[in-house]
Amino acid sequence: MATPGAASAELVIGWCIFGLLLLAILAFCWIYVRKYQSRRESEVVSTITAIFSLAIALITSALLPVDIFLVSYMKNQNGTFKDWANANVSRQIEDTVLYGYYTLYSVILFCVFFWIPFVYFYYEEKDDDDTSKCTQIKTALKYTLGFVVICALLLLVGAFVPLNVPNNKNSTEWEKVKFLFEELGSSHGLAALSFSISSLTLIGMLAAITYTAYGMSALPLNLIKGTRSAAYERLENTEDIEEVEQHIQTIKSKSKDGRPLPARDKRALKQFEERLRTLKKRERHLEFIENSWWTKFCGALRPLKIIWGIFFILVALLFVISLFLSNLDKALHSAGIDSGFIIFGANLSNPLNMLLPLLQTVFPLDYILITIIIMYFIFTSMAGIRNIGIWFFWIRLYKIRRGRTRPQALLFLCMILLLIVLHTSYMIYSLAPQYVMYGSQNYLIETNITSDNHKGNSTLSVPKRCDADAPEDQCTVTRTYLFLHKFWFFSAAYYFGNWAFLGVFLIGLIVSCCKGKKSVIEGVDEDSDISDDEPSVYSV
């Protein structure tokens, strides 16, 4: 018989893996932010803020497999609870995860609504050399106050918004919906926190639709297509230089006799001279790229990039198929929009929903897969942001360039990634709803068996995978799932957002297929902050 210490042992295993992953996350965030920040405009506070905010989001997402691991390890594969998993211990373990979410989500609210806006506006004011540091802080606090007010409003609305599902539904499914809404508790503080985080997750959904969906198609196709040849681009650039020089010479020849140039020719001459400066700058960068050992090294890795591109597009198709089947299942079998399209049981199986519970039985294989999925979303989101840029409606605010991203753009970048990572938890639920809800838990059901040797029927207890049909005391729902479904209207918005995600992915796939190869120095024409003596890092 297992001793009470087994509970502590199981808990320690899950949290030890979480601790190791935490260290890996911090290392990844430091490398990632340092890779993109500008070398000439690097600021310590903005760098630390970007690393910390991105790390908090990733750590929160890393709590998902810990949550699933702990509820799964309360039960044996035969559907019975383990000896140590009595009601008090189960509640204690669940509360441990819940307190983890409380802490991390509170820190996220602090970062999004106070610290990141404050640092951003501080550096916006710092660009003005005439202002003192005290004035910069006061101005930054004044603008940040608006974000604090928004956060306070979200907390107030979340604390008192009605959670009751419609009472005109009498079916057993609606009783289950009501149970799920009430399971996490009726605390106003918890409801306020959940509402605020769900609001941020909704914004993250919009960012995922804009950037991640496009990046999932752009990243693999860019790897497969590669970039244009530096030598060929340099040849074309040389021809353009000669052509522009001829135009300049033609215009200047009109004033050889001392006559002043007409205003039209002056404007044309100015444009050609500006164009010539840009072309010569491109010439220097192309020459550097062509002779670089890094270019030759990347050329040798070209077959590997093609293989990675094919792998990424296959993974993208796997996600899209799983998401489509999951959403179709909700459309056909859910309890409706008033329940947030909550689904009871998997009527249409999808690949990830079948794979994750199998991997979960061999810890930490599912942890590894979840980490890969989250990292995949991060890299595809980054690819989308690099291709599209950061926009406010039709105005481009910032470009994201490796080694050339300004402090303000870096904060924007990490804010967007933070919101996308928040939405990742719901994306994983959409891809594998049964896994996120119950993990690998089984419960016992009574089955009647007719025996030829004995008159009458006998009953046999057989294990069955946990689903919404299971008795409430036989299966433990993850805290993550309950956080995601505290408010039904957010779940409904996520459902429609998934369809939009699929649509944007298909559009991005078509656009990426139609676009030609990227320039080996793409962006050099637009980057006014590139100095002539700094031709370094480009994507090759």
From Swiss-Prot:
- Extracellular side, ranges: 1-10, 72-100, 166-188, 327-364, 430-486
Where does the record say carbohydrate is attached? N78, N88, N170, N347, N448, N457
Q: Where is this motif: YERL motif?
A: 232-235
On modification after translation, the UniProt record reads: N-glycosylated.
An annotated GO cellular component: endoplasmic reticulum membrane
Cytoplasmic-facing ranges: 32-50, 122-144, 210-305, 386-408, 508-540
Principal localisation: membrane
Q: Which Pfam families match?
A: LMBR1
Query: Where is this protein localized, as stated in its record?
Result: Lysosome membrane; Cell membrane; Cytoplasmic vesicle, Clathrin-coated vesicle
Q: Which residues carry this modification: Phosphoserine?
A: S528, S531
Q: Which InterPro entries match?
A: LMBD1_LysCbl_Transport (IPR050854), LMBR1-like_membr_prot (IPR006876)
**Keyword terms, alphabetized:** Cell membrane, Cobalamin, Cobalt, Cytoplasmic vesicle, Developmental protein, Endocytosis, Gastrulation, Glycoprotein, Lysosome, Membrane, Phosphoprotein, Transmembrane, Transmembrane helix, Transport
Give membrane topology per the record. Answer: Multi-pass membrane protein
MF annotations from Gene Ontology: AP-2 adaptor complex binding; clathrin heavy chain binding; cobalamin binding
Q: Which residues carry this modification: Phosphothreonine?
A: T238
Q: Where is this motif: WTKF motif?
A: 294-297
What is this protein's function per UniProt? Lysosomal membrane chaperone required to export cobalamin (vitamin B12) from lysosome to the cytosol, allowing its conversion to cofactors. Targets ABCD4 transporter from the endoplasmic reticulum to the lysosomal membrane. Then forms a complex with lysosomal transporter ABCD4 and cytoplasmic MMACHC to transport cobalamin across the lysosomal membrane. Acts as an adapter protein which plays an important role in mediating and regulating the internalization of the insulin receptor (INSR). Involved in clathrin-mediated endocytosis of INSR via its interaction with adapter protein complex 2.
Could you say which protein family the record assigns here? Belongs to the LIMR family. LMBRD1 subfamily.
What name is this protein filed under?
Lysosomal cobalamin transport escort protein LMBD1
Organism whose genome encodes this protein: Macaca fascicularis
List the top taxonomic levels of the source: Eukaryota, Metazoa, Chordata, Craniata, Vertebrata
